[in-house]
Regions:
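Short Gly/Pro-enriched turn/cap motifs at secondary-structure boundaries
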Residues: 41, 83-86, 110-113, 128-130, ...
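A generic structural signal for well-ordered coil/turn residues at beta-strand boundaries
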Residues: 73, 89-91, 115-118, 135, ...
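Internal helix-loop-helix
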Residues: 2-72, 112-119
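Short, intrinsically disordered, charge-balanced linker/junction segments flanking boundaries
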Residues: 1-2, 101, 180-185
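A short, Trp-centered hydrophobic/proline-enriched beta-strand micro-motif
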Residues: 71-79, 123
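A glycine-rich, basic-preceded beta-loop-alpha segment at the flavin cofactor/substrate interface
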Residues: 23, 144, 151, 156, ...
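Short Ser/Thr-interspersed hydrophobic loop/turn segments at strand-loop and sheet-helix junctions
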Residues: 4, 27-32, 123-124, 140-145, ...
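A short core secondary-structure module
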Residues: 91-92, 100-101, 105-151
């Protein structure tokens, strides 16, 4: 982690190498010659942190990118829902602003590594009056709060890398919103 190999293309100021995508390909080919498990870090390093680097505030980038790249924090994506699967526009998990905080209610499914994650990148509906491709917002969710229940989904082989995640009045402070309100699509 200290050498920045977890983030070959990610900026140096956040713990990456700041190299080109072709260098990432070369590294991946070389890494393939060894047993180098990435497992629970793959979603965070491959999807969540790149999204944060593209759309988050500078404060959010500083707070979340470096610990993830150093293997100190695990992330999951909270996107797919029962009844909508990969149709993200069909999301019905709610984020309602009450007393200056976002209150989250709903469910996600097929969430890889949620049972290990400290943080989740959450897509939730913030405006029900808009068409389904609008009114969606991104948030950073603290997965360790009591209002978040993670249930691993056992596969036929006995492993459980996927999960159902339930939110019952989970709380998110406004500074954990990523990008603008309604900019989740």
């Amino acid at each position: 982690a200290a050498a920045g190999f977890a983030g070959i293309t990610m900026p140096k100021e956040y713990g990456g190498q700041g190299l080109s995508p072709i260098m990432q390909v070369i590294y991946n080919l070389e890494e393939g010659n060894f047993i180098a498990p990435r497992g629970v870090y793959e979603i965070g390093l491959g999807m969540c942190i790149p999204t944060m680097l593209a759309y988050a505030t500078e404060e959010q980038k500083q707070r979340y990118a470096t610990p993830a790249l150093h293997g100190e924090e695990i992330w999951c994506q909270l996107f797919s829902e029962p009844g909508s699967g990969s149709d993200l526009a069909g999301a019905v998990t709610r984020a309602d602003l009450k007393n200056g905080k976002w209150i989250i209610n709903g469910q996600k499914v097929w969430t890889t590594s949620a049972h290990h994650a400290q943080w989740g990148l959450l897509l939730a509906r913030t405006d029900w009056d808009l068409p389904k491709h609008k009114g969606l917002s991104y948030f950073v969710l603290d997965m360790t709060q009591d209002a978040v229940e993670v249930q691993p989904l056992k596969q036929m082989n006995g492993h459980a890398s996927f999960n159902q995640v339930f939110f019952t009045d989970a709380v998110i402070d406004p500074e954990f919103q990523v990008e603008g309100l309604g900019d989740g699509w």
